[in-house]
Amino acid sequence: MAAAVDTFLFTSESVNEGHPDKLCDQISDAVLDACLAQDPESKVACETCTKTNLVMVFGEITTKANVDYEKIVRQTCRDIGFVSADVGLDADNCKVLVNIEQQSPDIAQGVHGHLTRRPEEIGAGDQGHMFGYATDETPELMPLSHVLATKLGARLTEVRKNGTCPWLRPDGKTQVTVEYYNENGAMVPIRVHTVLISTQHDETVTNDEIAADLKEHVIKPVIPEKYLDEKTIFHLNPSGRFVIGGPHGDAGLTGRKIIIDTYGGWGAHGGGAFSGKDPTKVDRSGAYIARQAAKSIVAAGLARRCIVQISYAIGVPEPLSVFVDTYGTGKIPDKEILKIVKESFDFRPGMIAINLDLLKGGSRYLKTAAYGHFGRDDADFTWETVKPLKWEKPQA
């Protein structure tokens, strides 16, 4: 490629499952999973906050399920690796507070008529606007900067849990800067410019050992060699010390990592968080169907890059607006693609829940609560399934 091409730098970050905000996301979604597993009609809005030696779950839940909230909190913390005060939280001995009430009857009658409505009549649980995004720069049709930052975070956890790097502790953050060029609206990654990893560690390890292990066991297996060169910059634990972490280091709250959960700063975001919300909450289900729409457009070859916006009013099933922009990469005009999207996707919340099988609990939502909701290769991530679009391909 000619060196004269104008390039730019774009950065995405991620945090791994031991970050206090992500711990809260996972607890909120573990509660949602437990409710849906017993009662698929559960209405859940579960928030979590944490600080040293304390976790609190609070919100509105209406369910027939019999759920032991404290047990779920402790189990989720334990599974992440918070098993002693040294690492930032002791799952078995921390204080757990629960303040959960029923969903407001005013909201209930407006959204689902106290469970009397058919799925296609269920109204949106709130107002709001959501975005879905897709780009052809990676096989998962996600931005490379975001994919790499996310995979580095997941790999950090993997080498901690499998004993490869026994000095690791649960909390950690990653950030990747990619050099791109703009090919008529499509994003083409050229190289990785900077890799930043800050990970919690124990007292026994030196900064040199940390840097060597991170390069060998985390960066090398994750970032394809073709993107690294002698100019790539590495910042590995640049603060010099990160022993205190998890809720001991920082307070955590559900819904504070919404860009990490989505597209790493690419596309756009309507502001609504995902975790702890059942599918009548369009913050979540709307964003999931918008991703499926955008991904299906790019996968069908209709565009190289695409964003879809939808918006809702509380109690109203049909979206108020649907918007599509292909950044000039569309094979046909955007207004034609918009028509295809409207014919191919049912954006009513009750139908999204059925078509994407969103009423299923288990560990379904817990899995989404760390390492991103999109671009994941897992059958439970039903919104990642490419949907055949209803359109007449122009004859060659």
UniProtKB/Swiss-Prot annotation:
Annotated binding of K(+), by residue: 47
Q: Where in the cell is it found?
A: Cytoplasm
Q: Summarize where Mg(2+) binds, as residue positions.
A: 13
A GO CC annotation recorded here is: cytoplasm
**As annotated in Swiss-Prot or TrEMBL, what is the tissue specificity of this protein?**
Expressed in roots, stems and leaves (at protein level).
Q: What does this protein do?
A: Catalyzes the formation of S-adenosylmethionine from methionine and ATP. The reaction comprises two steps that are both catalyzed by the same enzyme: formation of S-adenosylmethionine (AdoMet) and triphosphate, and subsequent hydrolysis of the triphosphate. May be involved in the synthesis of betain in response to abiotic stress such as high salinity.
Q: Which reaction does it catalyse?
A: L-methionine + ATP + H2O = S-adenosyl-L-methionine + phosphate + diphosphate
Cofactor binding description: Binds 2 divalent ions per subunit. The metal ions interact primarily with the substrate. Can utilize magnesium, manganese or cobalt (in vitro). Binds 1 potassium ion per subunit. The potassium ion interacts primarily with the substrate.
Q: Which organism is it from?
A: Atriplex nummularia (Old man saltbush)
- Do you know which Pfam families this protein is assigned to? S-AdoMet_synt_C (PF02773), S-AdoMet_synt_M (PF02772), S-AdoMet_synt_N (PF00438)
Q: State where it is primarily located.
A: cytoplasm
| Induction line | By salt stress, in stems and leaves (at protein level). Follow a circadian regulation with higher levels in the light.
Family (UniProt): Belongs to the AdoMet synthase family.
Tell me the protein's name. Answer: S-adenosylmethionine synthase 3
